[in-house]
């Protein structure tokens, strides 16, 4: 496996984000994941195999106004894509997303990323984004 060159790393994550979620829980998200780039996405690896250069999803929670960098997220989680995707291909998958522990208003995002590789942050990428209220259970 190797890093996907930046201009070839384009993807979309589509789904419906509820406006409110319970703090500290995990929520199922039915998603449609699309490879909009010109490079295949290696995603499926055998159990115990290294994940370097595989393509996955990143779910993250930020306080409003905070720069969307993983290190600044109030909470983040890597989510596996269960199969490889060829250019132009889409795949529907439900992922379980951990919800932020502390109640409040958050910017929520699910993006495509490559482990130790492409950031999927160039124009043409379509992450799933929403403002969400996290409430006490």
List where the protein language model places each region.
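Short proline/glycine- and polar residue-rich coil/turn motifs
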Residues: 80-91
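Short, surface-exposed loop/turn segments at beta-strand-coil junctions that are enriched for proline
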Residues: 96-104
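Asparagine-centered strand-capping/turn motif at beta-strand->loop junctions
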Residues: 33-37
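Beta-sandwich strand segments
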Residues: 42-43, 116-127
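Short, hydrophobic/aromatic beta-strand segments
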Residues: 39-58, 107
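Low-complexity, acidic Ser/Thr/Pro/Gly-rich terminal tails and inter-domain linkers that flank the onset
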Residues: 1-22
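Short beta-strand and strand-turn-strand segments in soluble, beta-rich domains
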Residues: 11, 60-81
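Short, solvent-exposed loop/turn segments enriched in Ser/Thr/Gly
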Residues: 24-30, 105-108
């Amino acid at each position: 496996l190797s890093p996907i060159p930046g201009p070839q790393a384009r993807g979309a994550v589509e789904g419906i984000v509820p406006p409110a979620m319970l703090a500290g829980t995990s929520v199922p998200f039915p998603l449609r994941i699309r490879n909009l780039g010109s490079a295949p996405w290696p995603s499926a690896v055998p159990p115990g195999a290294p994940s370097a250069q595989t393509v996955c999803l990143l779910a993250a929670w930020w306080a409003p106004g905070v720069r969307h960098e993983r290190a600044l997220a109030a909470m983040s989680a890597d989510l596996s894509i269960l199969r490889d995707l060829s250019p132009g291909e889409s795949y529907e998958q439900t992922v379980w997303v951990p919800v932020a522990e502390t109640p409040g208003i958050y910017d929520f995002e699910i993006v495509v990323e490559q482990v130790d590789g492409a950031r999927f942050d160039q124009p043409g990428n379509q992450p799933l984004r929403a403002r969400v209220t996290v409430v006490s259970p």
